[in-house]
Amino acid sequence: MLLAALYCLLWSFRTSAGHFPRACASSKSLTEKECCPPWAGDGSPCGRLSGRGSCQDVILSTAPLGPQFPFTGVDDRESWPSIFYNRTCQCFSNFMGFNCGSCKFGFRGPRCTERRLLVRRNIFDLSVPEKNKFLAYLTLAKHTTSPDYVIPTGTYGQMNHGTTPLFNDVSVYDLFVWMHYYVSRDTLLGDSEVWRDIDFAHEAPGFLPWHRLFLLLWEQEIQKLTGDENFTIPYWDWRDAENCDVCTDEYMGGRNPANPNLLSPASFFSSWQIVCSRLEEYNSRQALCNGTSEGPLLRNPGNHDKARTPRLPSSADVEFCLSLTQYESGSMDKAANFSFRNTLEGFADPVTGIADASQSSMHNALHIYMNGTMSQVPGSANDPIFLLHHAFVDSIFEQWLRKYHPLQDVYPEANAPIGHNRESYMVPFIPLYRNGDFFISSKDXGYDYSYLQDSEPDIFQDYIKPYLEQAQRIWPWLIGAAVVGSVLTAVLGGLTSLLCRRKRNQLPEEKQPLLMEKEDYHNLMYQSHL
């Protein structure tokens, strides 16, 4: 009944975030390299007549890149989105969207002036109706074609530079699976050759801001699809977990008793078909994923390579990550040491902070542990546990931001791997967002986490803690300095007093001080003339 009711709401709401807007998938838009669709409210491009935005040239960052990608002009994702479009909508004030038809995160209302703060909650804190609604929303998104977005099934070159558009419809859920595939896929070099050392959303500084935006857009899509403006993605707090406690039919799907690699027939997700999971096949054909179904969702939690991932992350691991003061370091990739980002992502040891190519920990550990569809980066978003997992990873990122209050320039401006500089536009989003745009507190984007709200009184203490620790380290020096200072002050005071007394005794009467010494002052009698 709930699912049927949700379907009835579908065409009452329009989506506003994703990859290629349907309105910009024509040969005219591609050959003119312009994506400035009209806003339905006034019929003008980008809602210009209503002051919502205007069509403007895309200004690309010229900051130098790291050495990881030695090519130029071979990948459609380079200098995003310039291969496809060099003019897009630039929205004003709190407006957002490919046609400036929606509001920035954290705002709502007809003029996007009303602030709002949504709260992401632990999935185990949801009531049964709330949990069932969440599962139904995911199922609806999986089976509803995106009204506003399509996915390209060929490169720009394969489209004859835009004259022969190649696009397919895709469901709301699979749109995000496709985006995660597209951002992390290998570069196609021709003749079955590929370049693998490239990823516009992982293994570099943009990992956390990119996934922050990704979840916000996914959340927003489901809000608009269902008409539930208060929907938020729940999180799974996997600290100290001994097994996959969300892997039950009540939640994200239990194990199939007949085949441990499949989900239980009683699960919401056992009938789901996955997409974009066959990277090597696409590479051999020099093709892109076209959204075709590729079989059932696979998951066999715990039966993974335990030499690479001995256990799930602990509370101590998380605390160590949060103790790392540097967001990024060194080469700014998966070899970075003492980098908060690299340690949280799982390429560095959460005990030492040293990069270790033989181990997968923290964020990576959960992907490996699931031992199935979620364990391969490009297609990992097929598994809905991806949402719960990345919501919790994002909450750890939020803890770090609140602890250190970094300025924007803490995020690297230059020399990061391709696509990861601060001013680089994030692939493959249209409208456009820069990496640095989401190096901000979640509250600035209109959401919070329930368990961080509970610890709100400790935020001030966290803020001053580094200063208190510094004061504690220099306390012995301060005491010693105070003692020496007191002795010097007493000696100098005595010498000054002695010199002043001698000088006073030598002064003529008219230059004697009006007040006498303390012992003489007490001998004076106030005499009245009355």
From Swiss-Prot:
Cu cation A binds at H180, H202, H211. InterPro entries: Di-copper_centre_dom_sf, Tyrosinase/Hemocyanin, Tyrosinase_Cu-bd. Residues 1-17 form the signal peptide. Residues 19-473 are lumenal, melanosome. Keywords: Albinism, Copper, Glycoprotein, Melanin biosynthesis, Membrane, Metal-binding, Monooxygenase, Oxidoreductase, Signal, Transmembrane, Transmembrane helix. Its EC number is 1.14.18.1. GO terms for biological process: melanin biosynthetic process; pigmentation; response to blue light. This is Tyrosinase. The chain crosses the membrane at residues 474-494. It is found in: Melanosome membrane; Melanosome. Glycans are attached at N86, N230, N290, N337, N371. Residues 495-530 are cytoplasmic. Binds 2 copper ions per subunit. GO terms for molecular function: metal ion binding; protein homodimerization activity; tyrosinase activity. Cu cation B binds at H363, H367, H390. Pfam families: Tyrosinase. Forms an OPN3-dependent complex with DCT in response to blue light in melanocytes. This is a copper-containing oxidase that functions in the formation of pigments such as melanins and other polyphenolic compounds. Catalyzes the initial and rate limiting step in the cascade of reactions leading to melanin production from tyrosine. In addition to hydroxylating tyrosine to DOPA (3,4-dihydroxyphenylalanine), also catalyzes the oxidation of DOPA to DOPA-quinone, and possibly the oxidation of DHI (5,6-dihydroxyindole) to indole-5,6 quinone. It is a single-pass type I membrane protein. It comes from the Eukaryota. It comes from Bos taurus (Bovine). Its cofactor is Cu(2+). Belongs to the tyrosinase family.
